[in-house]
Amino acid sequence: MKKGIHNYSEIGKLNRVLLHRPGRELEALTPATMERLLFDDVPYLKEAQKEHDQFAKVLKDNGVEVIYYEKETAKALKETAVREEFVSNMIELSFIESEGMKQAIRSFLMSLEPEKMVEEIISGVRRDDLGEVKTGSLSDLAQSDYPFVMDPMPNLYFTRDPGACIGDGINIHHMHTPARRRESLLLKYMFEHDPDFATEGNKQFYDIYDDYSVEGGDVLVLSKDMVAIGYLSLIHI
């Protein structure tokens, strides 16, 4: 694998692609959670995985190196201090008010190995995972029937959205909807700490914590000298 980011065309030869294989996060979609998680239908997991595997095979058969969010993010989280910072940022972007709940989630996630931690974050942290947690938050009590304390990421298989590779650099996008914003954090840590991406020469043009929303489908690399930016409902500038 050639290290770093090198993308100077939307239509040139594709050498490497970052994917997410649909997983347990799709099983979190129910009539009660669909709207909150931005779905209007419940996909069938086995069929989604079958279609994904066929797509990935076509890419591999044509010489494309396929890499996956879970493994690359886990590689970025090998150091304990990096994992601690990552978990704190994930909790912050989950809008959890109760300090007791924050600590319970932190303890649960930090007890896991990096790859398992990433899997659980993508699949969603359930109340049942934490056992009994004492909280004084009215908002938490109001949502006590909701199964998740940290929502799953069922939209992650739209891997183009959280970021855009531009030349030898990257945008880490501030996603428009709170339901998707944490997806960009996976990419941010991958870019900053995964040895296959965190090269000295790489540049970052936009960050998840910047003020305005941008999503990947709105950014097109036309040539080494030109980028087109769409101005649509999900992009605020």
What kind of region is each of these model predictions?
Residues 1-235:
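The feature marks the mature, well-folded catalytic cores of soluble enzymes
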